[in-house]
Amino acid sequence: MSLFDFFKNKGSAATATDRLKLILAKERTLNLPYMEEMRKEIIAVIQKYTKSSDIHFKTLDSNQSVETIEVEIILPR
């Protein structure tokens, strides 16, 4: 589902499905209260060893039991 999918005309079933997916994705992140603390700790460790402040987290894939997060680190030359 991309950002542009929200602006297309589609049926009510497809709209309801998209809304449900967004709600479920949000609820999954709410069920993991340690996730934000873990991100802060990862940033602290990366900054300690690389002196980089350009760190980005991306959630790639989520299902009922696994959430995959990608960390992008821009290293200075």
Curated annotation (Swiss-Prot):
Q: Hey, which family's this protein in?
A: Belongs to the MinE family.
User: What keyword terms does UniProt attach to this protein?
Assistant: Cell cycle, Cell division
Record's InterPro entries?
MinE, MinE_sf
Does the keyword Isomerase belong to this entry?
no
GO terms under biological process? cell division; regulation of division septum assembly
Q: What is the lineage of its organism?
A: Bacteria, Pseudomonadati, Campylobacterota, Epsilonproteobacteria, Campylobacterales
Its job:
Prevents the cell division inhibition by proteins MinC and MinD at internal division sites while permitting inhibition at polar sites. This ensures cell division at the proper site by restricting the formation of a division septum at the midpoint of the long axis of the cell.
Tell me what this protein is called. Cell division topological specificity factor
Give the residue spans that cross the bilayer.
none
Biological source species: Helicobacter pylori (strain ATCC 700392 / 26695) (Campylobacter pylori)
Q: Which Pfam families match?
A: MinE
